[in-house]
UniProtKB/Swiss-Prot annotation:
EC number: 4.2.3.160
Role noted for this protein: Terpene synthase that converts its substrate farnesyl diphosphate (FPP) into the sesquiterpene protoillud-7-ene.
Protein family according to the UniProt entry: Belongs to the terpene synthase family.
Name of the protein: Terpene synthase 1
Catalytic activity from the UniProt record: (2E,6E)-farnesyl diphosphate = (2S,3R,6S,9S)-(-)-protoillud-7-ene + diphosphate
Gene giving rise to this polypeptide: TPS1
Keyword presence, Magnesium: no
Organism: Acytostelium subglobosum
Amino acid sequence: MSLSLNDIKFPMHWNLDPNEFSYVEYVYREGLELGVWRPDNKRDQMAHTNVVSLSRYFWPNVDFDRLVMGGELMLWFFTFDDGLDAGIYDDQKSLELVRRMDIVFMDGILPEDPTGPEKVALRLRNKCLAMCGRRKDTFNRFITSCVQWVDSIIPFNKVKVGGQSPHIELYSFLRKINIGAYPCVTLTEVMLNHHLESYIWADPRWIKMNEDIAIVVTLINDLVSYEKEVNDNAGDLNPLFFFQRQNNVDLCDSYKQMVTLIDYYVDHYVQLEQGFLRTLAKYHNPLQEQEVNFMLDHLHYLITGSRMWSMQTPRYCSPTSPFIEMRKFREA
């Protein structure tokens, strides 16, 4: 059976050309310094490149320093989340790690025996604090989004009750936080030189736009990770898999349902964006309009970049993928 990710349609102006690649090596050296990666370990190097390279798709037009910050965010996501997802910690230890990470972000201090991900988190936090300057509201939004993501990991991993997959609405409600899109958006706000009024980010349309994009990113991630998760016996939390069981349909029909869902959220987002732009006060200078467009472009790039990155990453590509665009190599 051959499915195509190109069945998913986005507006043409959401397309992107990825940023340059040299930051990946820079962030890798940081990972070695902070104890996230083991020296001269090819598996670590491959994992790092696969995950951190996503930043060049999410932030295709930023300078090197900001691209590094995006890479650090991806490095933190991957190393902290995969540790909890791997099942190597019991519930008590997992909760302890979550609470420790919350303190790193909220208080800006490390525990006495810091882990590599905690060191990465503190470095990124301190960079954001310096870049924000007087923009305490921006900094607080970034910290809040990171804490919310950290706090979502354990609840999402517990969402299966009695071995049953959740309803798609419950799944989407939890996953839109757990996917990690919100910290990407608030980090993008940190990157601004900032000529915008802070009330913009409290607009309910803006918040709903973020939610719609997060759900689309989630669904794209579920599509591209389908084969890997099924092979790892983790398909119960993948809607492409559990739609087949819940609705008694085959893979092709399950994919059609996923595409229909994505189409709905993309269309709803476009309507919200149009309303959001109509409600904004008149721009005082061209920089304000540029910064609004910069934020909107980032939302667009989160989903188009996710799909583009997924078509080439060894993390998900495989000769036996159900998606023709992903029938390539896979990492060992």
